UniProtKB/Swiss-Prot annotation:
It comes from Desulfatibacillum aliphaticivorans. The gene is ndk. Its main location: cytoplasm. This is Nucleoside diphosphate kinase. The keyword Transferase applies. GO terms for cellular component: cytoplasm. Keywords: ATP-binding, Cytoplasm, Kinase, Magnesium, Metal-binding, Nucleotide metabolism, Nucleotide-binding, Phosphoprotein, Transferase. The active site is at residue 115. One of its GO terms (biological process) is CTP biosynthetic process. Major role in the synthesis of nucleoside triphosphates other than ATP. The ATP gamma phosphate is transferred to the NDP beta phosphate via a ping-pong mechanism, using a phosphorylated active-site intermediate. Its EC number is 2.7.4.6. Belongs to the NDK family.
């Protein structure tokens, strides 16, 4: 069964949207197999988003992602990577389809409420970043 990582970002946690977002995944038939609340340090945010290190938004992104608690989750289901990305909507909420998380809940392109892996390889890497094998056992 396919797995992906989704993160409820600090802006959504601060606005008490965890339940709203989780319900959207569950209503879509997606199983949440692991979930935790944590606060990334600046160094952890930089490591997680290292792929964007040369991009102009890297500093702001890592500052934002280390600004408050977030909720990484492992989602599981058939075609869950694509399904998750459809439920999240486009990165820029102005371009996101109506009814998606970002269209309904995001503040702006940076504070867009959720992150989702974009491919099986990145999903595996991102899951391993947040969850140990012990946490995934069972």
């Amino acid at each position: 069964m396919e797995k992906t990582l989704s993160i409820i970002k600090p802006d959504a946690v601060e606005r008490n949207l965890i339940g709203n977002i989780v319900k959207r995944f569950e209503d879509a038939g997606i199983k949440i197999v692991a979930m935790k609340l944590l606060k990334l340090s600046k160094a952890q945010a930089e490591a997680f988003y290292a792929v964007h290190k040369e991009r102009p938004f890297y500093g702001e992104l890592t500052d934002y992602m280390s600004s408050g608690p977030c909720v990484p989750m492992i989602l599981e289901g058939e075609g869950v990577i694509l399904k998750n990305r459809e439920i999240m909507g486009a990165t820029d909420p102005k371009e996101a389809a109506a009814g998606t998380i970002r269209a309904d809940l995001a503040i702006d392109k940076e504070k867009n409420s959720v992150h989702g892996s974009d491919a099986p390889e990145t999903a595996a890497q991102e899951i391993a970043f947040f969850f140990t094998e012990y946490e995934l056992a069972g």
